[in-house]
């Protein structure tokens, strides 16, 4: 009586293991791959994922389908990936806050953590700006700060309290003792129209999203979240020039569910590496002011550890930790 269920369990486990190994075998991929993006269409993470998918399809010879799962500061998409079958057919292209949600527990409790994901590689480093409409009455960050000091409750747009955009605002507000109202959006795709429409006077969009609007004289940017000025926009000062600390920079990269086989991780990492070396891919990124800084799996895993430490120290200094 005991042997039947025992054998059933043994065969079931063998079958399950075979299915996962088969998925990662030499025939991978043999069907379309889904890439979850945790923000709405139109933002830098979405744009980067779609451009990568276009070039990855050429090498994988299978469709790479980008699916937007926005909401809850990116944790809806993050949880969807952590809960997906680890067979290599569901991946995620995530910003840093979605990749390591546990370090932002001061702002929310995520239903997963970075331990539920496997890093594959880093690809993009977004350039975040402090921007206003071109007809705004301020012509520099200094003028904006002076106005905000005299006018408490000024609205600043960002894309979630776990994001670098929000921390950029908090850095400014804390350093200058400003009383502001932060207004969260699901992503650049919804925040930028709100800025253009005058619903928020100040916002923190990524440069690659608003570059056409800067050139078209619809927006103006006062600063970038970088240690030094961006080569593509040398007239825009970096935050340290105003005396503000930049302890880390955000990133975007590929992730997979925790139990995804090594063969899949290696395959996707190798494909992405080749894509980032493609001159056409590089030229398209440059044209959109998207910075490509590829890191393979091993390097990205090490970087994540440093990133967590740096962010936690920064949040502690800013008083953004639970007591």
Task: Describe the residue ranges of each PLM region.
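An extracytoplasmic/periplasmic, membrane-proximal ligand-sensing/linker region
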Residues: 30-32, 174-178, 262-323
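Short beta-strand/turn micro-motifs at beta-sheet edges
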Residues: 24-25, 116-120, 236, 240-245
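A ligand-binding cleft/hinge motif common to bilobed small-molecule-binding domains
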Residues: 97-107, 170-175, 202-234, 312
């Amino acid at each position: 009586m005991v042997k039947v269920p025992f054998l059933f369990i043994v065969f079931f486990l063998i079958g399950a293991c075979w299915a996962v190994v088969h998925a990662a075998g030499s025939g991978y991929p043999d069907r379309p791959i889904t890439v979850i993006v945790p923000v709405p269409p139109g933002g830098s993470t979405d744009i980067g994922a779609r451009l990568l998918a276009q070039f990855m399809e050429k090498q994988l010879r299978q469709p790479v389908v980008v699916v937007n799962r926005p909401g809850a500061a990116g944790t809806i998409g993050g949880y969807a990936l952590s809960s997906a079958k680890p067979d290599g057919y569901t991946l995620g292209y995530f910003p840093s806050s979605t990749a390591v949600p546990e370090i932002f527990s001061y702002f929310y409790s995520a239903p997963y953590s970075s331990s539920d994901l496997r890093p594959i590689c880093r690809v993009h480093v977004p350039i975040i700006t402090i921007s206003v409409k071109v007809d705004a009455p301020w012509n520099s960050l200094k003028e904006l700060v002076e106005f905000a000091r005299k006018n408490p409750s000024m609205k600043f747009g960002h894309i979630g309290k776990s994001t670098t955009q929000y921390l950029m605002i908090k850095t400014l507000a804390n350093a200058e003792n400003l009383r502001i109202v932060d207004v969260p959006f699901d992503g650049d795709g919804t925040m930028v129209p709100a800025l253009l429409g005058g619903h928020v006077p100040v916002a923190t969009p990524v440069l690659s999203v608003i570059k056409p609007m800067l050139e078209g004289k619809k927006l103006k940017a006062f600063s970038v979240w970088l240690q030094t000025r961006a080569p593509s926009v040398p007239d825009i000062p970096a935050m340290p020039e105003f005396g503000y600390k930049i302890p880390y920079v955000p990133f975007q990269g590929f992730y997979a569910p925790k139990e995804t086989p090594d063969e899949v991780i290696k395959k996707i990492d190798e494909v992405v590496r080749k894509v980032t070396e493609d001159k056409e891919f590089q030229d398209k990124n440059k044209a959109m002011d998207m910075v490509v800084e590829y890191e393979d799996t091993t390097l990205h895993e090490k970087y994540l550890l440093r990133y967590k430490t740096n962010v936690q120290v920064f949040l502690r200094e800013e008083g953004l930790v639970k007591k």
